Amino acid sequence: MMFKLGVLLTICLLLFPLTALQLDWDQPGDHMLDISSEIDDRWFDPVRKCCMRPICMCPCCIGP
């Protein structure tokens, strides 16, 4: 009986691994909230979606 439970548990863990659960802050949309909250609203340009500071180290200003 214990062998069958072990096999069933193994199959369940292979089919539904614990790492498949969605974690907080692992999606790109979650990180955009952090970036926009760090930028001062007086310097933010909604058209460019970036700040208008003369010296800017934001990811959107550095860009590829």
Curated annotation (Swiss-Prot):
Disulfide pairings: 50-60, 51-58, 56-61
- Which keywords does this chain's UniProt record carry? Disulfide bond, Hydroxylation, Secreted, Signal, Toxin
Extent of the signal sequence: 1-20
- Subcellular location field: Secreted
**Species of origin:** Conus regius
Its primary localisation, in coarse terms, equals secreted
Q: In which tissues is it expressed?
A: Expressed by the venom duct.
Q: Which residues form the propeptide?
A: 21-48
What is the UniProt domain comment for this protein? The cysteine framework is III (CC-C-C-CC). Classified in the M-1 branch, since 1 residue stands between the fourth and the fifth cysteine residues.
- What's the family? Belongs to the conotoxin M superfamily.
Q: In this entry, which stretches build a coiled coil?
A: none
Sites where 4-hydroxyproline occurs are at 59
Keyword Signal included in the entry's annotation? yes
Q: Which GO terms describe its molecular function?
A: toxin activity
Q: What name does UniProt use for this protein?
A: Conotoxin reg3k
User: Would you tell me the Gene Ontology cellular component terms?
Assistant: extracellular region
